[in-house]
Design a protein with these regions (language model features):
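Glycine-rich, often acidic-flanked micro-motifs
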Residues: 2-13, 27-210
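Conserved glycine(s) of the Walker
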Residues: 16-18
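Post-Walker A alpha-helix
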Residues: 21-22
Length: 210
């Protein structure tokens, strides 16, 4: 996600709410979508830049139901059926819907690349009653958080000699730490409150006040 000359990457484990949080931040008109998949990062002119894989957000019915802007992506009958489900059933409903950003949020909300100035790692818990907390962390000292950050490039990166990474190739933690050196990392803990964390990310991380 980008906002002017600032940008943040959201990391987390599967089902952690990365896409939902990003869509909450896109409700702010000054933000722009960069990728719903991997981002490649490289240092240029003493700053870290990220380039995203061109992939639209994919959301589940719970995200769609709880965001009125997204209701255009479902039929009235679908919305009615989802509203009748218990929250736990809705959370585990295995259906995915692509979000056509231009249709839902308007033109000009997609960027191919931008600066990386913050990294947010979602480590919150759905069954927690605690308020969500966004706290700066040292990922060099919290190596377990790297598991949520490191992703295989899959077919999107090729070595100069034509080779691709093999399945099962171990990640180079030191390379990630070196690449992210100087980028403030933040861990989100506590219970899940998308709007509260979206507001804090926009007010602090994307505004440069943190």
């Amino acid at each position: 996600l980008s906002a002017g000359e600032r940008g943040l990457a959201i990391a987390g484990f599967s089902g952690g709410g990365k896409s939902t949080l990003m869509l909450h931040m896109l409700e702010r008109d000054h933000t722009a979508f960069l990728s719903n998949d991997r981002v490649f990062i490289r240092r240029a002119d003493n700053a870290l830049q990220m380039r995203g894989i061109a992939k639209l957000p994919r959301i589940n019915p719970g995200t769609l139901l709880n965001n009125p802007r997204l209701h255009v992506l479902a039929t009235p009958q679908q919305l009615q059926d989802w509203e009748a489900l218990a929250s736990d059933e809705l959370w585990h409903l295995e259906e995915k819907y692509d979000v056509p950003l231009a249709r839902v949020y308007g033109e000009g909300r997609i960027r191919l690349a931008g600066p990386l100035t913050s990294l947010v790692i979602l480590n919150w818990q759905r069954d927690s009653d605690a308020a969500p907390r966004l706290q700066r962390v040292d990922i060099g000292a919290r190596r377990e958080l790297l598991a949520a950050v490191m992703k295989s490039p899959g077919p999107f990166y090729q070595y100069a000699d034509g080779r691709f990474l093999c399945d099962g190739t171990p990640f180079d933690e030191a390379a990630y730490l070196q690449a992210l050196d100087g980028v403030p990392a933040y861990e989100v803990t506590g219970g899940i409150d998308f709007e509260a964390i979206a507001q804090q990310c926009c007010d602090e991380l994307l505004a440069g006040t943190a």
